[in-house]
């Protein structure tokens, strides 16, 4: 379907470098006879370190041999955290070019600030392609600067043939775009060598900071980085690419939020709640990590039933997947590959309309008084024109944090009440758990809590009494002692802050 839609090059990778899991995708690309299978090795560790015993040159060469045997057209090195030093790039690329007659494509992130040197070393060793970003969007968690690379190779044997002036002329546009997306910045003001310790992928580093802020942990980010490094070791140093990087990040955030030392968790994981993504990883949901299973696996999975990770195509989608209608096939693929996200997307459209027609600035920041925009409801239809909406005035918040907003919709004045999430409310705050009371079960961090226990239930310490979901992370909340559920802090799924009371357990 993607090839039919115009995709020419498919970068295929597995989060744990398992070629057997990449083969179906490689074979599907080969069957098109028109597209390119670029198969990537996720890079981790430091192959120049004499103490490196997992991600060695021999490891990557054996992996590359499996990739070539599977039918790859292009070999890619996917250095998601920017860990590959120049000497390592030269050594690895040289070895790949000596053994395999395939183009080599190098991808990295510039978190530490030295990856232009890595690209120069890779190119001189025979790399054919590298990934860059326009200068205003380059550096730190992004890729090295395109302008810098073009200038570095100008008038040399590896001259790119790209006009530096043409590249520079595009930069003001991307500077303006970056300002619109400023709230999603990583928060890293410049390069950081800490990446060589924590190994957080560039694509995850900004998301992790956003997650930390949402969980109320934003001021403890350096501790989160330290815990990420510790969790990486605990889980056996897996290659960290989506979704394996999420597993490490989820556990690091969870331990920081719950105030649990990584060493204590590693010694007795059954004492603590474990995020669902971590349980799935330990159950083999993502495959087998390159270094084998970590020591805590058996203890963490004790009393949990084995899970069959085979996914069957729902019968109701089989016909749609074989449909001649392009749109029907696409919807079926969305439902099959991303069922939760598809449902959320449809709910968003039912609630807010077709928001992808709004300008980025309007979508992220809203209208200013006197500003007008067009809004679509339902699918875009030439027979049903959009609504013209102008923001006229915004009132002061009331005691519940509600503001009256005056709009003009298609020429008619429409007042409405809107909750201001940033306004202070005089409504009583949620009850806090008493840390000195072992019967008080608290939310470990900010999120939406759903209490699964009922008043009167007999529970043992460690039994799950609720679940919490926040920023794509799900985890259980367990009883803190043996006893009876005496009181629930709320009856419906509720947004809470870290430390809010969830349930009260009376001791037997």
Spell out what each predicted region is:
Residues 1-103, 120-127:
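Alpha/beta enzyme core
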Residues 80-260, 268:
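Catalytic alpha/beta core domains of metabolic enzymes, predominantly
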């Amino acid at each position: 379907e993607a090839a039919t839609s115009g995709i020419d090059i498919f970068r295929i990778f597995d989060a744990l470098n398992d070629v057997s899991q990449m083969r179906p995708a490689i074979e599907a690309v080969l069957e098109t006879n028109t597209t390119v299978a670029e198969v990537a090795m996720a890079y981790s560790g430091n192959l120049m370190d004499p103490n490196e015993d997992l991600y060695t040159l021999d490891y990557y060469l054996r992996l590359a041999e499996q990739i070539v045997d599977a039918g790859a057209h292009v070999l890619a090195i996917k250095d998601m955290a920017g860990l590959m030093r120049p000497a390592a790039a030269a050594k690895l690329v040289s070895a790949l070019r000596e053994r395999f007659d395939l183009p080599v494509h190098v991808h990295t992130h510039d978190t530490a600030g030295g990856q232009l040197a890595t690209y120069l070393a890779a190119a001189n060793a025979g790399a054919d392609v590298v990934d860059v970003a326009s200068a205003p969007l380059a550096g730190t968690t992004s890729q090295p600067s395109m302008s810098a690379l073009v200038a570095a190779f100008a008038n040399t044997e590896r001259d790119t043939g790209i006009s530096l002036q043409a590249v520079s002329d595009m930069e003001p546009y991307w500077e303006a775009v970056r300002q619109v997306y400023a709230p999603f910045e990583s928060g890293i003001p410049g390069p950081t060598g800490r990446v060589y310790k924590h190994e957080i992928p560039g694509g995850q580093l900004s998301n992790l900071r956003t997650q930390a802020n949402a969980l109320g942990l934003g001021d403890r980010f350096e501790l989160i980085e330290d815990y990420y490094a510790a969790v990486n070791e605990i889980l056996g140093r897996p290659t960290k690419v989506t979704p394996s990087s999420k597993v490490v990040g989820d556990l690091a955030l969870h331990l920081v939020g719950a105030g649990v030392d990584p060493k204590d968790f590693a010694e007795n994981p059954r004492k603590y709640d474990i995020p669902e993504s971590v349980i799935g990883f330990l159950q083999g949901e993502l495959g087998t990590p390159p270094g084998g299973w970590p020591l805590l696996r058996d203890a963490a999975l004790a009393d949990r039933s084995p899970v069959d990770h085979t996914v069957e195509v729902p019968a109701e989608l089989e016909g749609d997947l074989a449909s001649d209608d392009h749109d029907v096939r696409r919807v079926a693929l969305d439902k099959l590959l991303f069922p939760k996200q598809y449902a959320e997307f449809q709910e968003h459209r039912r609630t807010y309309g077709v928001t992808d027609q709004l300008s980025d600035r309007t979508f992220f920041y809203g209208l200013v008084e006197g500003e007008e925009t067009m809004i679509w409801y339902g699918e875009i239809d030439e027979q049903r024109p959009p609504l013209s909406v102008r923001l006229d005035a915004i009132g002061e918040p009331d005691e519940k944090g509600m503001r009256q907003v005056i709009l003009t919709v298609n020429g008619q004045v429409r007042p409405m009440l809107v909750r201001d999430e940033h306004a202070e409310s005089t409504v009583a705050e949620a009850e806090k758990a008493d840390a000195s009371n072992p019967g008080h079960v608290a939310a470990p961090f900010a999120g939406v809590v759903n209490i699964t226990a009922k008043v009167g239930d007999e529970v043992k310490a460690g039994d799950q009494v609720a679940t919490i979901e926040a920023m794509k992370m799900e985890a259980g909340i367990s009883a803190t002692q043996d006893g009876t559920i005496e009181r629930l802090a709320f009856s419906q799924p509720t947004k809470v802050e870290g430390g809010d009371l969830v349930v009260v357990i009376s001791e037997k």
